[in-house]
A protein has these predicted regions:
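Conserved acidic carboxylate
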Residues: 8, 32
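Active-site residues of response regulator receiver
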Residues: 52, 82
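C-terminal output helix
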Residues: 105-115
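The feature encodes the CheY-like receiver
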Residues: 56, 74, 86
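Charged docking surfaces used in two-component/phosphorelay signaling
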Residues: 15-23
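Residues at the ends of beta-strands that form strand-to-helix hinge/output surfaces
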Residues: 86, 103-104
Length: 131
């Protein structure tokens, strides 16, 4: 079961996304700011990080840069999540080290299509029959 870390300061967004991903079969961890996201990534080594870019204290841009500079976590894919869909934001996220980018409000189908580039789809695996 792929382990997903959601780094999101908005409680409603965090809870809704974590519930929806758990229903899809993912193991979900949550962090509420960039510092906690870095610490949890280093400790738990998730398969994927969903990183809000607008976080208090340490924003998602800097948290991602730090994760990508750390030899223990640089291999972990990060998908940037942002409500700021301004021209150039996707490029800025990729430059910060994000592997993919998605905008809020999140559409689960669109997000899942991006996630499966990096982690297995637990529902697809559950539907497979053993050989």
């Amino acid at each position: 079961m792929p382990k997903i870390l959601i780094v999101e300061d908005n409680e409603l967004s965090r809870d809704m996304l974590s519930r929806r991903l758990r229903r899809k079969g993912y193991e979900v961890l949550v962090a509420t700011d960039g510092q906690e996201g870095i610490a949890m990534t280093q400790r738990e080594l998730p398969d994927l990080v969903l990183m809000d870019l607008s976080l208090p204290d340490l924003d998602g841009w800097e948290a991602t840069r730090r994760l990508k500079k750390d030899a223990r976590t640089q291999h972990i894919p990060v998908i940037a999540l942002t409500a700021h869909a301004m021209s150039g934001d996707r490029e800025k996220a990729i430059d910060a080290g994000c592997d993919e980018y998605d905008t809020k409000p999140l559409e689960l189908r669109r997000l899942l299509s991006k996630m499966v580039r990096f982690v297995e789809d637990p529902e697809a695996k559950a539907g497979e029959t053993p050989a």
